[in-house]
Amino acid sequence: MEEPMEVDNKRPKVLTWTEKYRPKTLDDIAYQDEVVTMLKGALQGRDLPHLLFYGPPGTGKTSAALAFCRQLFPKNIFHDRVLDLNASDERGIAVVRQKIQSFSKSSLGHSHREDVLKLKIIILDEVDAMTREAQAAMRRVIEDFSKTTRFILICNYVSRLIPPVVSRCAKFRFKSLPAEIQVQRLRTICDAEGTPMSDDELKQVMEYSEGDLRRAVCTLQSLAPILKSGDDNARNCYLRGSSDSLLISNVCKSILTADVPQIIALTKDITKSCTGVAFIRRCFQQLMDEDVINDENIGVMGKLVATCEKRILDGCDLENNLLDFLLTLRETIQ
């Protein structure tokens, strides 16, 4: 008979960097002053409404909700008072009936502290992924249990929520984080982890992540072993995932005057230096920023970008698709 395998319970818990460096208090939340001021007011005893946090991904919506709840409730009653759900995992009406409603009906856990708010909080992340039927059921729960329960709803697209849910919440838009704040946060993580990266490389990671700080931190963690190994070839190869800024600038400047052979040569350079999707997006964005594309052609160019991206992601030849993109781009803006 085989002996049971021993389990090492003393092994340290391994956390992803997004969890390890998630803001622990409201003061750690960056660039969302309006939301932080309101939540600090609730900590000091002001009325707490149902809340709706919306805005781009990676801007601190979930972190702000969790940091607020950690400061609001002592650790010994935190799990009795806070329910954290991700609606994208369970989109239907069952999650409302089985989890949200049952938690709302449960009695408040006892606390010896007089200053602890006599409420429960339900954090519902990615609520815009819920079906309309589930949202309607949730609206009834919000109404029925408003004396004992507050909801913090989190989504990227507020337009996907039904009006009766939106009207019952105080809305707060989370702004996109400026580049300097993202680079500063990434630099703090690099220093703490002993990961050598220049500011230019951090900017490349940030550009690749398209303003999503959570995605940037995940990218940084996956890149860390390569950086620590000292393998410059692997380092440069990985960082090509965020397109070369100088190359994109050269393409945008020469696209109007270049002939077909020159565009073919540019395409070969792009294929060697960049990922196709990242290049197409950043090239389009730069031309928009420089007002090269007029209002009449924005729709045409948007369709071109989407078509080329889909072809590349579906596995079509990268060089041919980039050539098609550049030639069509030149024809459109001339």
From Swiss-Prot:
Its main location: nucleus. GO terms for biological process: DNA repair; DNA replication; DNA-templated DNA replication. GO terms for molecular function: ATP binding; ATP hydrolysis activity. Keywords: ATP-binding, DNA replication, Nucleotide-binding, Nucleus. CDD domains: AAA, HLD_clamp_RFC. It comes from the Eukaryota. ATP binds at G55, P56, P57, G58, T59, G60, K61, T62. It is found in: Nucleus. GO terms for cellular component: DNA replication factor C complex; nucleus. Coiled coil: none annotated. The elongation of primed DNA templates by DNA polymerase delta and epsilon requires the action of the accessory proteins PCNA and activator 1. This subunit may be involved in the elongation of the multiprimed DNA template. Belongs to the activator 1 small subunits family. Heteropentamer of various rfc subunits that forms a complex (RFC) with PCNA in the presence of ATP. This is Replication factor C subunit 4. The lineage of its organism: Eukaryota, Metazoa, Ecdysozoa, Nematoda, Chromadorea.
